[in-house]
């Protein structure tokens, strides 16, 4: 009974967060644990779309999927030799936020954001996540950050 109670409480918290979300992002493992499903399209249609139009799923070396009301697109991960994946998700999220700011995407722009702009934003997330996976640190270095920002 205690497990069911905990699962119910977690489910209620997830729904509350979905109601406030403008972008939902998680890994395939996250959604397997939450919903018992790893198919991103199925998770989007059955659990996310009603609450939020923009859904990003990360799949490690198998890339990133973006689902919106208007389109679905897959982005391949860069080929790297990972040392550790600790921090990859947090750095991906940081890269997404950086990309939104870099490309001057505002809240009002999200519903009509085109595939090319999404691609640039997601590339920022993948760049930061890929960088952190190539070290034993769970964050990007100051040197990488400075170089990355100067390339913009």
What name fits each language-model region?
Residues 1-45:
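Conserved beta-alpha-beta core of the PfkB/ribokinase-like small-molecule kinase fold
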Residues 37-152:
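Conserved phosphate-binding/catalytic region of the ribokinase-like
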